[in-house]
Amino acid sequence: MPRWRNGRRSGLKIRFPYGSGGSNPFLGTTFDVILEAPLMNPLVRRISNLDLIRGIALLGILGMNAISFGLPWAAYWNLSAAGSETWLDFAIGVFCEIFLDQKMMGLFSLLFGTSIVLLVDAAKERGYRRPVLLSVWRNLLLFIIGIIHSLFWDGDVLRLYAICAPIVLLLRNSRPRLLVAFGIFLVVGPATLTLLLQPLFLSDGSLDMTTNWAMNVGDGIGLGKYWFVESSTFGATVGLFFLLDNLGRALGMMLIGVALYRMNILHGNRSLRFYRLVAITGLLIGLPLSSIGTGWLVTSDFANTIALVSLIPNTLATIPTVLGYIGLISIWDSKVKNRLHTHISAIGRMALSNYLLQTVLGIVILRVVFEQGTLGRSQIALFVIFVWALQLIWSKPWLDKFSYGPCEWILRKLYRW
């Protein structure tokens, strides 16, 4: 008999008996039938592949965010700026640049775009008259949460995502190919501007005040804290670039996420051959590009003269690497459903709670318990592993008892009020 849990029935299984085989694909197959009270939740099953991708992305994001918790911002981009005193520190920094930087945030942004479409579609199925307005209200709440979050850490992405969300809503029904093309343009376009911006800076990283641009901008800060530990601000030129770059990469990946969802790629139910092709092709293109960009910086001893243009290879690598990761994760989701899979998926289902928890732990441990800038990358990596273990341990038991994470529950109550 089906069991009632939190106002909905679950656990009903239909099993077709084993037979002699033939061509019937249903023989020996067990189906989980989710029976939910119609007024409680939409008749939509969670897509396990999305939860798994989101969980892995969130864990990977911490690998980069922890650098900004424990070290000055310059160390995030410039490995020689701080935190790389030993060969192990440096090796960890190179690994993160190649495998994590931009890629994990790209995965996370991609899934955020998908979640916007999922919410609107689910609201329509439930009979909401204004599903788009519901999504706008939800993202306004996320923006408010992001403002509060940014008071403690200036690397918050919730505000950025909330700003991009209305554009995703406007374009969500566009053709997938158009969304992909526009998304690629938004991701790659801002990075190409570095070809114009890099000549504005002198070899010492200061702004060339003889140029028309510098005379109009007039702050004279140069690369600022993007590249130098001793600087406390980005400066107008670098700040404007990162504003455009962050908006472009976030919105671009969201639109690509909508396209991949419409193309039935993110569900994880394409053939294994398809996902193998995506994984191999994406990683063979993306990882060498990231390696070239990182190698360029290392061999130049992180020269000021390539501080901005060196971003181009890694940006070009983002989309193919993200697709490669999606291929690998989808293969895992379809072939192996072990305890690790279950616990990482639980992290993905509680992404907002776990994202905010990472910040709380990062600020408390890496800035209060230990003074910022006193730890190396290898020591910060131990913090990352600790938080991973904590979130792997607590997320699944929480969801066994409750339907949502604590922050997800609060957000849900507010936007469905």
Write out the residue ranges for each language-model feature.
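Short, positively charged low-complexity motifs
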Residues: 3-6, 19-23
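N-terminal signal-anchor module of multipass membrane proteins
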Residues: 41-112, 119
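Functional transmembrane helices that form membrane-embedded active or gating regions
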Residues: 46-57, 278-280, 333-361, 403-415
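Juxtamembrane membrane-water interface segments that cap and precede transmembrane helices
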Residues: 84-98, 223-239, 301-311
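Specific transmembrane alpha-helix
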Residues: 106-121, 158-170, 245-268, 317-337
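Solvent-exposed interhelical
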Residues: 130, 167-185, 259-281
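Long hydrophobic alpha-helical segments that form multi-pass transmembrane helix bundles
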Residues: 185-262
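Alpha-helical transmembrane segments of multi-pass integral membrane proteins
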Residues: 301-401
